[in-house]
Amino acid sequence: MAGAQPGVHALQLEPPTVVETLRRGSKFIKWDEETSSRNLVTLRVDPNGFFLYWTGPNMEVDTLDISSIRDTRTGRYARLPKDPKIREVLGFGGPDARLEEKLMTVVSGPDPVNTVFLNFMAVQDDTAKVWSEELFKLAMNILAQNASRNTFLRKAYTKLKLQVNQDGRIPVKNILKMFSADKKRVETALESCGLKFNRSESIRPDEFSLEIFERFLNKLCLRPDIDKILLEIGAKGKPYLTLEQLMDFINQKQRDPRLNEVLYPPLRPSQARLLIEKYEPNQQFLERDQMSMEGFSRYLGGEENGILPLEALDLSTDMTQPLSAYFINSSHNTYLTAGQLAGTSSVEMYRQALLWGCRCVELDVWKGRPPEEEPFITHGFTMTTEVPLRDVLEAIAETAFKTSPYPVILSFENHVDSAKQQAKMAEYCRSIFGDALLIEPLDKYPLAPGVPLPSPQDLMGRILVKNKKRHRPSAGGPDSAGRKRPLEQSNSALSESSAATEPSSPQLGSPSSDSCPGLSNGEEVGLEKPSLEPQKSLGDEGLNRGPYVLGPADREDEEEDEEEEEQTDPKKPTTDEGTASSEVNATEEMSTLVNYIEPVKFKSFEAARKRNKCFEMSSFVETKAMEQLTKSPMEFVEYNKQQLSRIYPKGTRVDSSNYMPQLFWNVGCQLVALNFQTLDVAMQLNAGVFEYNGRSGYLLKPEFMRRPDKSFDPFTEVIVDGIVANALRVKVISGQFLSDRKVGIYVEVDMFGLPVDTRRKYRTRTSQGNSFNPVWDEEPFDFPKVVLPTLASLRIAAFEEGGKFVGHRILPVSAIRSGYHYVCLRNEANQPLCLPALLIYTEASDYIPDDHQDYAEALINPIKHVSLMDQRARQLAALIGESEAQAGQETCQDTQSQQLGSQPSSNPTPSPLDASPRRPPGPTTSPASTSLSSPGQRDDLIASILSEVAPTPLDELRGHKALVKLRSRQERDLRELRKKHQRKAVTLTRRLLDGLAQAQAEGRCRLRPGALGGAADVEDTKEGEDEAKRYQEFQNRQVQSLLELREAQVDAEAQRRLEHLRQALQRLREVVLDANTTQFKRLKEMNEREKKELQKILDRKRHNSISEAKMRDKHKKEAELTEINRRHITESVNSIRRLEEAQKQRHDRLVAGQQQVLQQLAEEEPKLLAQLAQECQEQRARLPQEIRRSLLGEMPEGLGDGPLVACASNGHAPGSSGHLSGADSESQEENTQL
């Protein structure tokens, strides 16, 4: 695999195990400070380790998802009750002095800010400690966090089984709540499984086995996507796969082609048989070595079929390289829980950051106020709250190594201008951290030029301090007096101002009264700014009003220098930044704590290279770092090979938003600090990336960013010699249980990496009101060339149609497996979600240029290639002489690399992605080339930037939400009208039938007397004929009256349907026009974005050309720079003109496509109107016959049993049967067409 370590990694991860004590349960008193409640409960954990559960006072089972537990604490770190009543009940103040050891606090929550504290007190001694340790192990288990799809479904089943009511039964309402997106669908699935489905009912646990639950899920969430996969891989209509088909599928589709076949051999028949035995539920299929669709579905969700290999999750990289060789998980302003101006500071944030894998936290320390004079942490010159430094250090000592044993860096931003309080800070560090605090450098790594930094392995369990260091200059130095004099003057002025004002908080400014001469860090140091400068801008009104709050511009300037020394360039303007614009100088006590992380002011990469001190590091605000990244990217990479660099957000991010960390990982910056309290895409990417390598907080940088003999340009667009590029295709097939609402869902696929590798906002269409089991199965998203896969990450995220976040997953590109896989989604804080998942298909492989594909195929299957050569030789022998054939064979063998013919694919299984066109590779010209690009290359550049915008097809617009709502309303209106007509028709029919029956009875009575004598037979016959004639005329009148009513009703329905059709056509036309307007707006935005992107590419090429020119002959440098600028202007003008021409052509194509859609709509309108008129006419023509048949029937007595007669006899309106329902179905079909 690209970027993998040689050999097979020995997996160290272990699955979660629940000890007997937790399964059996223990007695605790659960107490709550807010409600003053305390209840005796029995805590238990289910055998799988999914949930912590207990029975509350209402006899309902409460559960806590163990994966949401962020920490467990006992002893002095657990929360103590403050309520006197609770303290009395728990026994505090009594003779038992070991009560603290019985306390346990469970911290849980969806993110580090919104945490919930559950407080327990064990009844027996030592119970709390066992529970705290075991619960924490379960919560932090990496395999549990990355469980298979089947495991998460089993987890949902376990929750339902645990949450029983007082009778020990499973309430149906809990099932409806778990699958709340479509409750009707849930009820139908429960009923089809023979289970109770009424909300008020409950189910016996023995009736709800795991097999029944799986059957319920299959009924609830139909899977046509898996049926299609089975068909594609060779089932061919059969409901099963044979052993050979399954083995071929796993070896050809599910196998990573980048793996070595010796170290990772293909699946053998015996192994495939074991998979069938594990996943196939049907015994008959099992006996025949076959896998059914249900067994295949289980296999896809099994642990063997994860999207990532387990070694990617394990601690699998070399941890013995210098610290500078790693990306280190870092936090900025760790104490804040919200914004930068008025947010709340919290000690808990330090715990949560460290537990989340952060290895570098920031401490902004300020001088404490009398009388305590305790240093505290806050964000200076803002209204953020304060927390004591001592509490923070104790929290760090408690949690520093609970999730990772590797070193923690304390990044001090020191504003304590009191020698006494700085000494107190140092003493706190020594006493609280003890032996964990690294004070003296390691013997193997002295603080000397050229000596590399120690490794994370060397520093395991150690805490390092980053703080300005005090250096004493040599006594006989030539410029010592020159340095000392201005500093002494500055210090005397500061001392006088300190004596006059005695400020003690950052809100009023903190003068550097303890600044001492000679604090140079080996570099020239400028004068301190007058300490009371910020007060000039306050005025009396500002002082009376309260704390001085900086504006965004001031904050950016302040943050820009927060960890650097003062600017020494007198030409640069100064600003009123307050004392927080620079740290105060360190005293001797704090300086002795600094060793391998010594901050210095950054001057240039050349100066740092000459000093060659690996233990010196510099901090960059993101804007300055971007400037260096843009101007000198390769030098930045070289700097980060030896020394550490820390990047932090600019001060204008007052909302605590984050920059994209990938920008600075690309140049090898180690300490890329982010605001952990803001879970935006940048923080989500950070959390996802640092999940790997055992969540150690350290990720080894790619080899080219570490080796001193290799140079690396992060802006390269070509394959780098020695780095195996990758190709990746991702097809989003379907989703399952993505939301608890009945809404549309869409999926975005992004790639983050080098600029050439980064792709944003690939997106599927939005499903139509289906969040249970949407199926997309669209064209794949293609990433044809990933230049540096070990630094690239894939993000797959699902959203509701309104843009609400559903879940996402961050995957390292170099570890993604090929084939069909479930991606179980995570929340913003990277915690696993139980039910939401996506089924995707991936093709991951080593990148091969198109002109080398034939060579690659020959190397993959050399036997087939040689056989093809032999076959060609034999064919030649039949046409020419034997001797010439031999010569031709030799020639063929000599030139086979140039004459490789087209070969049939060695893979007999068709790919679901074969139908999609392959994206052409990007331009192969180096952006650093100083020659003007050829027209063909420039056209490739335009094509790579330009995105196509196609008009929305009419069929897709018919599914628009507005049209769906209109159709629903029209169908409801038509149903109401028909019900009204049916009632009238049934009433009239009943009256007519009664009249016919009465008339017939009267006629028989009149004829009956004549039947007693035989003398008047002729007269009786005549009377009978007259009676029959009168009866027939009466019948005709009855039929005619019903016919007139039905004709009027049919005409009314026809008129209503015509109105509906015209409304629907009008609404469809409006939808088309709205879609066209939206596309034009989007096209305009795309035009601007493409122009900016083109300009960025051209500017980057110019910068690279200038950099190359500077490294060549200095005498020709000026002339060459002038020529580069001239060519840049010419190429920019020409490229923008070509881009505008291409954009105009794209606009014309879009207009033509939209006109075609409107023309299609215009052509369909008369057809639909004519079709409706014909349907109504035919329905009217059928009325006489239908009414006579319904009213009179075909019986000789004259009274039939047609639908209307039946309805009239039963006394209710007809349902879906009969002649009245035909128009209804026609209307539904007509609406479906729209």
Swiss-Prot record:
SUPFAM superfamilies named in the record: C-terminal domain of PLC-beta (SSF69989), C2 domain (Calcium/lipid-binding domain, CaLB) (SSF49562), EF-hand (SSF47473), PH domain-like (SSF50729), PLC-like phosphodiesterases (SSF51695)
Coiled coil residues, start to end: none
Positions with biased composition (Polar residues): 576-587, 887-908
Name this protein carries in UniProt: 1-phosphatidylinositol 4,5-bisphosphate phosphodiesterase beta-3
C2 domain sequence ranges: 707-835
Regulation of its activity: Activated by G(q)/G(11) G alpha proteins in response to ligand-binding to G protein-coupled receptors.
Ranges where the PI-PLC X-box domain occurs: 318-468
Domain PI-PLC Y-box: 590-706
Active site: H332, H379
Gene3D superfamilies attached to this UniProt entry: 2.30.29.240, C2 domain, EF-hand, Phosphatidylinositol (PI) phosphodiesterase, Phospholipase C beta, distal C-terminal domain
Domain of life according to the entry: Eukaryota
Biased amino acid composition, Low complexity: 488-515, 925-936
Assembly notes: Interacts with SHANK2. Interacts with LPAR2.
Enzyme Commission identifier(s): 3.1.4.11
Stretches the record annotates as Disordered: 467-587, 887-937, 1198-1234
Chain's gene name: PLCB3
UniProt GO MF annotations: cadherin binding; calcium ion binding; calmodulin binding; molecular adaptor activity; molecular function activator activity; phosphatidylinositol-4,5-bisphosphate phospholipase C activity; phospholipase C activity
Residue list for modification N-acetylalanine: A2
Modified residues (Phosphoserine): S474, S490, S495, S537, S926, S1105
InterPro entries per record: C2_dom, C2_domain_sf, EF-hand-dom_pair, PI-PLC_fam, PLC-beta, PLC-beta_C, PLC-beta_C_sf, PLC-beta_PH
CDD domains given in the database record: C2_PLC_like (cd00275), EFh_PI-PLCbeta3 (cd16210), PH_PLC_beta (cd13361), PI-PLCc_beta3 (cd08625)
